[in-house]
Design a protein with these regions (language model features):
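Active-site microenvironment of metallo-dependent hydrolases
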Residues: 1-273
Length: 273
């Protein structure tokens, strides 16, 4: 809109068209048969939200309104908080004495490139070890590889948000910190951890299935921003999101190289390398 687009066309593109694309056919408009999820804004210049409606019920008008929380089966609640089945990890779990493919990150992109092979981490040359640990069935499957372009100089970063299987993915300068970071994720029943010399520098706890939190939005966002700052402090490249970028390294459908619990996968040739 600030670049001259018609406000009605821009809002339709963002709301109605996007919902149609994802087959969310009862969202994206205010009309009979739609859910009635919408926001009221002040104007088309500032887009400050004044009211929020969910299924036609006012939820926010400057302050959050009380609303009945949906009831959830207690058994499902218990299961959602018990999704980590992983044996204690040690530095030896992250070292098999073999060379592995190097995933080359591209700044500003989630696609990657083949950056050759490496047989050890070399943070000064921006070569770091990367691993994915299976965490659902206690199989002890751990895929190993290397990554270039992440920028970390010390410590390790781990997260249980790793599309789409949401295993534990960890990048580190040392095997010891990688093991410590992954163990911390298991201890917290999910989340994000930034670790150095066995000490937690920053973390976000995501104890619901390892990908969600029952803390407030403000608390989670504050912890996330603090963890990002700590990751940048360890050398992570400022041009990337330390955690979002890492999460997509485990999605083996986006070219070129990704990592799974079985190792580095070449998406283009559909084989492990």
């Amino acid at each position: 809109i600030s670049l001259g687009a018609d406000p009605g066309v821009a809002v339709k593109a963002a709301c109605h068209n996007a919902a149609r694309y994802f087959l969310l056919n009862n969202r994206g408009a205010i009309a009979p048969g739609y859910l009635g999820d919408f926001v009221i804004i002040d104007d088309f210049q500032h887009f400050e939200i004044e009211m929020v409606y969910k299924r036609g019920v006012l939820m926010y008008d400057g302050q959050l309104r009380d609303f009945p929380a949906p009831e959830i089966d207690p058994y499902l609640v218990k299961r959602a908080h018990d999704t980590f089945h992983v044996a204690h990890l040690t530095a030896e779990d992250f070292s098999d004495g073999r060379p592995h493919a190097v995933i080359g990150m591209i700044p500003g992109e989630i696609v990657t490139q083949d950056a050759g092979y490496a047989d050890h981490a070399d943070p000064e040359q921006d070569i770091l070890k990367i691993a994915v640990i299976e965490r659902h069935k206690n199989t002890h499957h751990i895929g190993l590889g290397y990554i270039k372009g992440y920028g970390l100089k010390r410590g390790a970063v781990a997260t249980s948000i790793s599309h789409d299987s949401h295993n534990i993915i960890v990048v580190g300068a040392t095997d010891e910190d990688m093991a410590a970071a992954a163990n911390r994720i298991v201890e917290n029943r999910g989340g994000i951890t930034v670790m150095e010399n066995g000490q937690v520098l920053g973390e976000v706890t995501l104890s619901i299935a390892g990908i969600m939190s029952d803390d407030s939005l403000v608390m989670v966002n504050s912890a996330l921003e603090d963890a990002k700052d700590e990751a940048f402090g360890l050398g992570v490249s400022r041009g990337i999101d330390p955690f979002m970028t890492l999460s997509f390294m485990a999605l083996p459908v986006i070219p070129s190289l990704r990592i799974t619990t079985r190792g580095v996968f070449d998406v283009s040739s559909q084989r492990y390398i």
